[in-house]
Amino acid sequence: MADESKFEQAKGNVKETIGNVTDNKNLENEGKEDKASGKAKEFVENAKEKATDFIDKVKGNKGE
């Protein structure tokens, strides 16, 4: 899923750049939205991973 968020960020960057070069504000804004969405998904993925790691660590220390 991390690849999906990175792809969304890259797609957004391309749209934003093309929109900027062609003076197409709609495409530029769509690109900015895609980038922000991709970054948000990546943040959530990282938070989930850290929470899971923490829970696993706590569970592992219970038996000791």
Swiss-Prot record:
Lineage: Bacteria, Bacillati, Bacillota, Bacilli, Bacillales
Sequence similarity: Belongs to the UPF0337 (CsbD) family.
PANTHER family on file: UPF0337 PROTEIN YJBJ
Biased segments, Basic and acidic residues type: 25-40
One Pfam family here: CsbD
Organism: Staphylococcus aureus (strain bovine RF122 / ET3-1)
Descriptive protein name: UPF0337 protein SAB0772
Top-rank lineage group of the source organism: Bacteria
Region described as Disordered: 1-40
Xref: Gene3D superfamilies: YjbJ (1.10.1470.10)
